[in-house]
């Protein structure tokens, strides 16, 4: 699995069809952004279950240990670790609650390279959910941009969802809105994953290699 997003020379605002035999097209960034403004509106709440075993929540959710216990949370991924406009918790905050903690210092800015955390965050979630009774809270300050971006990347990398399917899966269950720069990075990840799958398909025994 790719550990990050490769640099792309493609225009991020145009659609890309990686596999000529597939109907799927990676949308341009603006079209991807429109997915968050179409369909039924989901009211904002502090925390939502968006995938089996995965909750996305906000700072309030992350700080309330009794509430985490009620949800059965065993792992916390803080996508807003740090002191400045972030959620200041850490592993020690959850030690008495027997909750495993992982934090990343991500800024909710379009220029921030959040893709550097795609692989380690996905690995943390994957390992947490390897035990059937575990539940993961992925949070930032509002639970809309940084945390949502990492969950979307996890679904794409570990469950082979396209960026479109991942967005639809999560936005139907929580009010999310990754910033424009994060969407560009998710789009680049989508293209990278599509290219990897196309390469694997062409290298599979009995498959004709296209030139």
Swiss-Prot record:
One of its GO terms (cellular component) is nucleus. Keywords: Cytoplasm, Hydrolase, Nucleus, Protein phosphatase. It is found in: Cytoplasm; Nucleus. InterPro entries: Atypical_DUSP_subfamA, Dual-sp_phosphatase_cat-dom, Prot-tyrosine_phosphatase-like, Tyr_Pase_AS, Tyr_Pase_cat, Tyr_Pase_dom, TYR_PHOSPHATASE_DUAL_dom. It catalyses: O-phospho-L-tyrosyl-[protein] + H2O = L-tyrosyl-[protein] + phosphate; O-phospho-L-seryl-[protein] + H2O = L-seryl-[protein] + phosphate; O-phospho-L-threonyl-[protein] + H2O = L-threonyl-[protein] + phosphate. Residues 46-195 form the Tyrosine-protein phosphatase domain. Its main location: cytoplasm. Substrate binds at residues 139-146. Its EC number is 3.1.3.16, 3.1.3.48. The active site is at residue 140. GO terms for biological process: negative regulation of MAPK cascade; protein dephosphorylation. Gene3D superfamilies: Protein tyrosine phosphatase superfamily (3.90.190.10). SUPFAM superfamilies: (Phosphotyrosine protein) phosphatases II. The keyword Cytoplasm applies. GO terms for molecular function: MAP kinase phosphatase activity; protein serine/threonine phosphatase activity; protein tyrosine phosphatase activity; protein tyrosine/serine/threonine phosphatase activity. PANTHER family: AGAP008228-PA, DUAL SPECIFICITY PHOSPHATASE 29. Dual specificity phosphatase able to dephosphorylate phosphotyrosine, phosphoserine and phosphothreonine residues, with a preference for phosphotyrosine as a substrate. Dual specificity phosphatase able to dephosphorylate phosphotyrosine, phosphoserine and phosphothreonine residues within the same substrate, with a preference for phosphotyrosine as a substrate. Involved in the modulation of AMPK and MAPK1/2 signaling pathways. Belongs to the protein-tyrosine phosphatase family. Non-receptor class dual specificity subfamily. This is Dual specificity phosphatase 29.
